[in-house]
């Protein structure tokens, strides 16, 4: 039990660092807004020049209080730790180390930023915490429904994309943001569920092959190939 809990905290801290790298090294320098708290903080940072980490902390205060009430003290504690780690890592990289953008090419920045953030969020979820913002709302919804976490986040991120388009006065940057968010949601699923797999099933039958093929297609939507053997 102790070993598992230590591993959970390692997931949370490492995920927080990856998320911070995605924001500071790829997205924020290129005015590309990711989703959730990080994306909203990037937008607000360009409206009022407070450090992104501070904005993230301010946005998450009411949501953390909600998590205490509805999601339990342990989850809330881990979420507070995660939010603090992200805020510290973001401002450490941006304000103290002065980390420069790894790429000014929008395609590379969007994809690698999305990969860093998606992997980071996946690790944070795997550790039993939330990065705050949309992820807390997603946790509330997914705990009561069968909707996937990534789907909820994708919907909520749309609001951030619209806000980014208005603030940055660029539809193109909003479109890049959508690509980054899509990449991050796919990485969340890969970390939590694993990479998608495909299987081949061989069915041997002496008769009724066409009927069997039709039944498989009608029930599963999967086509097949009939091979005659001797």
Go through the PLM ranges and name each one.
Residues 195-230:
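Peripheral (non-transmembrane) domains and long loops of multi-pass membrane proteins
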Residues 1-209:
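Core subunits and conserved enzymes of cellular information-processing
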């Amino acid at each position: 039990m102790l070993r598992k809990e230590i591993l959970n905290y390692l997931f949370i801290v490492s995920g927080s660092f990856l998320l911070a790298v995605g924001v500071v090294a790829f997205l924020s320098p290129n005015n590309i807004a990711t989703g959730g708290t990080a994306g909203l903080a990037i937008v607000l940072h360009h409206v009022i020049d407070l450090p992104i980490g501070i904005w993230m902390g301010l946005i998450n205060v009411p949501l953390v209080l909600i998590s205490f009430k509805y999601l339990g003290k342990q989850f809330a504690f881990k979420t507070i730790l995660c939010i603090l780690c992200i805020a510290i890592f973001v401002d450490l990289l941006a304000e103290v180390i002065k980390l420069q953008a790894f790429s000014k090419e929008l395609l590379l920045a969007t994809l690698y930023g999305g990969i860093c953030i998606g992997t980071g969020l996946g690790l944070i979820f795997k550790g039993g915490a939330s990065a705050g913002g949309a992820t807390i709302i997603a946790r509330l919804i997914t705990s009561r429904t069968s909707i996937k976490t990534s789907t909820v986040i994708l919907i909520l991120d749309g609001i951030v994309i619209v806000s980014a388009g208005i603030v940055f006065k660029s539809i193109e940057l909003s479109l890049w943001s959508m690509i980054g968010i899509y990449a991050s949601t796919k990485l969340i699923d890969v970390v939590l569920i694993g990479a998608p797999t495909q299987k081949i099933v061989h069915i041997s039958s002496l008769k009724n092959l066409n009927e069997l093929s039709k039944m498989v297609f009608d029930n599963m939507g999967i086509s097949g190939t009939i091979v005659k053997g001797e």
